Amino acid sequence: MDTTLRDGEQTSGVSFAAHEKLSIAQALLDLGVNRLEIASARVSDGEFEAVKRVASWAERTGNIQKLEVLGFVDGDVSLNWIEAAGCRVVNLLCKGSYKHVTEQLRKTPEQHFADIRSVINQAIERGIAVNIYLEDWSNGIKNSPEYVFQAVDSLRDLPIRRFMLPDTLGILNPGNTYEYCKEMVTRYPDLKFDFHAHNDYDLAVANVYSAVRAGIKGLHTTLNGLGERAGNAPLSSVLAVLKDQLGVDTTLREERINYASRLVETFSGVHIPPNKPIIGEHVFTQCAGVHADGDSKNNLYCNDLLPERFGRVREYALGKTSGKANIRKNLEALGIDIDENSMRKVTERIIELGDKKEMVTTEDLPYIISDVLHHDTMADQRIRILNYSLSLAQGLKPVAALKIEINGEAYQESASGDGQYDAFVRALRKIYTDLGRPFPMLTNYSVSIPPGGRTDAFVQTIISWNYAGVDFKTRGLDADQTEAAIKATLKMLNKIEQ
């Protein structure tokens, strides 16, 4: 079960709009997730409308039983909310530790169990299926196991689909996760259990591994590991561990995980760390030249986590640790062949740039080669920016006027935009549209400057593009941010002409 849309949305600063929830739900089901927890009942009017929208789509497509909503032991209040939203499964939040019952609810276990039974009976009468969370189960099984067993024993005769065991405060480790889960599975072999990990000690994935080894059949995850505090077990890591480390067959389509993860990154505003396993930007990038050389010799530096499994490709970084093998791999991708002497000079220049902490992309290579081999960089360009003017005035939209040359022909256009660079790109698009030429889609835009906060520091702008289904990046470096972006854009224009 994926809970990105419920627990994941409890990440500080994250809130999904209705259309975003629907898009994420569709991506998760396309990925092969079996169940989705899409909301908590009673949260807000906006959440209610979002759940209605997702449920309406799920009803039309035959997926309504895959949607679940967190509900509370509150009589019929949560059930009314869930039913009105169009959902058919409640995940009832019950207390899984004696301390929570007596100190938070200020009730006896018997009173709490009676309240739970009442809600479950109402749900069944309405045709709403029931799973139950034993909230704070990890503390409960550790400090008051007799209460946990009493709770399960008093409720097991009811038509509960799954008993869900959350490590609510993320206190478990792989050793006691196995011990406690094994105890539940052994004691109640006829019941279905889920394990819900939290990542407070950075052990969520390891604990999932132990839970499965102990016999747990249901797992809770989130895309990108979003969730309360340190988050939940990330779906990307869990799917790889299940297949490679445990040999477990699932319905998950690995090649879809990167798309779903990037979608959530965009909607949540929470960036994926570049070194995050499976989905991080750098995890399929070889930096050391010896690794690239080994990859050319029967994949000596590859493990089972091949990037193609996850809809990605292996890359070879260019920097001070690069060797000729790294550079050759990137030149092959560009269809460029140079002799050994030229290769040595290019390698030296890339190492020099790396020492200065400058980022070198594949698309920079033709420029570096031209520079190193004393060619006229502009001579090989099919697209030139002849001149341009950018204006910014208080109370008025920025305006850009530009003149470019394409294959020897000059074209001129102007446009306004929400910023100077936006105006520049809009003017470019006008020219390309008039010529019937496709224009790449800008997918990401990042700016960085060296530490120190100097106003005259060089700005590095890295722009990600998608053209004809192919993703690539271009880089511009200048003391002016807009100039840096324009340089990156010019590289893009010539890149697509190759």
Report each predicted region and the residues it spans:
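A mid-to-C-terminal "edge-of-domain" accessory segment
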Residues: D2-T4, G247-S414, R454-F458
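Short, ordered loop/turn segments at secondary-structure junctions
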Residues: L5, S40-A41, F72-D74, C94-S97, ...
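Alpha/beta enzyme core
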Residues: D7, T11-L36, W57, T61-G62, ...
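Non-catalytic terminal/interface segments that mediate subunit docking, oligomerization
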Residues: Q10-T11, S15, E20-I24, L29, ...
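Short beta-alpha connecting loops at secondary-structure transitions
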Residues: V101, D167, T221-E228, A240-L252, ...
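Catalytic alpha/beta core domains of metabolic enzymes, predominantly
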Residues: L169-L172, E179-S296, Y301
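Mixed-charge, glycine-accented linear interaction segment located at domain edges/termini
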Residues: V470-Q498
